[in-house]
């Protein structure tokens, strides 16, 4: 089945890479706020979920505009570059957020199903390639050029939509079960 899937580097299917790593309020002439736009970092992305919500910081409108020249949009894929490494999140919201420390945003070209690409990036095959391209001994990290060389395998767009739809339904069921367990 996968033998007829097309293999290509991630950069071939990516429209935009949003990489504002290293930016801080101080470097941009601002400060953290008590409210406003959430600033996600690598520590907030784990196993396809936003975690440690209590550690999320905020910036005001002015700092948001300075920081996020390219905004995260619904359908973008967030991926951590280090600490933790290779964690993914599919952004399925219209909320405007700031990409903070050690986090890339990927916008997939329209002729591909971004949700399918997200699920593909969660596969053992893709994660192993990420590990093979990583650098560092104490803290393992991934540079953007190496990420963009990683191979993606894609079937035709109709099959991408079908596969993504099945995994989305499974994720929704998992979330329902987790909520039920939390309320027991």
Q: Where would I find each of the regions flagged by the language model?
A:
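Non-catalytic DNA-recognition/assembly elements of restriction-modification systems
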Residues: 1-23, 149-183
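Sequence-specific dsDNA recognition surfaces
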Residues: 7-30, 43-74
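Residues marking the start of alpha-helices
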Residues: 1, 28, 55, 63, ...
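A short beta-sheet element
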Residues: 41-42, 58-126, 143
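A short glycine-rich beta-alpha junction/loop motif
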Residues: 81, 97-104, 115, 135-164
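A generic secondary-structure signal marking the coil-to-beta-strand transition
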Residues: 6, 35-38, 55, 102
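Short glycine-enriched loops at secondary-structure junctions
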Residues: 45-46, 83-85, 135-136
